[in-house]
Each structure stands twice: as structure tokens, then as C-alpha cells.
């Protein structure tokens, strides 16, 4: 029982937690822009599932993690555009449409997995990039500063997104449209 609470296990769990939460951070940043523009997208999880499957499949078949990442971004963007079109242009209820997009992403990703793969495969992920000096800090260095590049980019995007939304003309326009769609 004591080995469960050892420093190595706790550090490993916390480090993995940060790495595994990164896709949700990306989704939250993207959804923040959507929310501020007045679109409630409850289908974000479906976007993530379809993007994750597309990314995995492309990375598996091409051997390129970069191609997989690019296709995930493309699939997520297309799903977001489709959601925006349905709610803004077709005047569909955002909550119901979002749930529909979530269920579509859930079902389609599972269907494509079974049709195209059928069995569990693995793809080696992006390599860990330790940040010099900071990664040597006991405990905190191992948790925060020995991650892959996508984790670092996600955390850098948080203040960038805040700046864009709150300190730029583009952010003002996004917030204005979200507050008053008739403007």
C-alpha cells in the first residue's frame, strides 16, 4: 500500500494528468472563442473524438505525427464550422444541435475505428522536451517541465487567447457579436 503513495507514483500521476488534460485545454481555449462570439457548442467532445480518430488514423498510416496533428485540427475546425452554420444560419437550437454533434462525433469515430482498424493499434506520441534548468527542479520540474511540445504550446496559448479576446480589435469584435448578434 505504501508504494501507491510513493513520490515516484504521485509525480508520475500528476505529470500524466497534465499531459492527458492538454487536449481539453485546447478545446476549452477554442470553445472560449465560440462562447464569446455567442455560439454555445455542446458538441466539443464530439469534435475532439472525431479529430482524435482522424489524427490517430493518419499518424498510423503515414507514420507522421505532424500530419496527424494537422488533420485533427482540420477535422475539429470543420466540425466547429458545421456547428456554427447550423446554429447561426439555420437558426437551430444551440443546445440540441450541440448534443447532436456530440453524438455524431461519438458514433462516427467508433464506426470508423471498427471499419478501418478493428483492433487496437499504438502510435508513439511526441517526445518529451525537458526545459533546461526548470526540469531539474525537484518534484515540480518532473511534473511541469518534462512534457511534450504540445503541452507547452497549450499553456502558452492561454495568455495569448486572453490577450486576443481582451486587448485586440479582433477580440472586441468577437465579444461584441457575442453580446449583441444584431449589431
What are these regions (language model features)?
Residues 1-12, 136:
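Short, strongly hydrophobic alpha-helical membrane anchors
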Residues 12-61, 69, 73-74, 78-95:
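Single transmembrane alpha-helix segments in multi-pass membrane proteins
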Residues 32-39, 64, 92, 115-122, ...:
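Transmembrane helix-loop junctions in multipass membrane proteins, especially transporters and channels
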Residues 63-71, 94-97, 101, 149-153:
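Membrane-interface starts of transmembrane alpha-helices
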Residues 74-132:
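A generic, well-ordered mixed alpha/beta core segment in the N-terminal half of proteins
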Residues 106-167:
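Transmembrane helix-bundle core of multi-pass membrane transporters
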Residues 160-183:
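Membrane-helix/interface signature in polytopic inner-membrane proteins
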Amino acid at each position: 500500500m505504501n508504494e501507491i503513495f510513493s513520490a515516484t507514483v504521485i509525480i508520475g500521476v500528476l505529470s500524466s494528468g497534465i499531459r492527458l488534460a492538454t487536449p481539453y485545454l485546447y478545446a476549452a481555449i477554442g470553445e472560449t472563442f465560440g462562447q464569446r462570439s455567442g455560439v454555445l457548442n455542446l458538441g466539443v467532445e464530439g469534435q475532439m473524438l472525431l479529430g482524435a480518430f482522424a489524427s490517430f488514423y493518419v499518424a498510423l498510416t503515414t507514420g507522421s505525427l505532424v500530419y496527424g496533428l494537422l488533420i485533427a485540427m482540420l477535422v475539429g475546425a470543420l466540425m466547429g464550422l458545421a456547428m456554427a452554420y447550423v446554429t447561426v444560419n439555420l437558426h437551430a437550437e444551440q443546445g440540441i444541435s450541440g448534443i447532436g454533434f456530440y453524438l455524431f462525433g461519438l458514433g462516427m469515430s467508433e464506426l470508423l475505428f471498427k471499419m478501418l482498424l478493428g483492433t487496437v493499434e499504438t502510435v508513439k506520441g511526441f517526445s518529451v522536451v525537458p526545459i533546461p534548468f526548470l526540469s531539474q527542479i525537484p518534484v515540480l520540474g518532473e511534473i511541469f517541465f518534462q512534457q511534450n511540445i504540445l503541452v507547452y504550446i497549450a499553456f502558452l496559448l492561454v495568455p495569448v487567447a486572453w490577450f486576443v479576446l481582451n486587448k485586440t480589435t479582433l477580440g472586441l469584435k468577437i465579444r461584441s457579436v457575442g453580446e449583441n448578434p444584431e449589431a
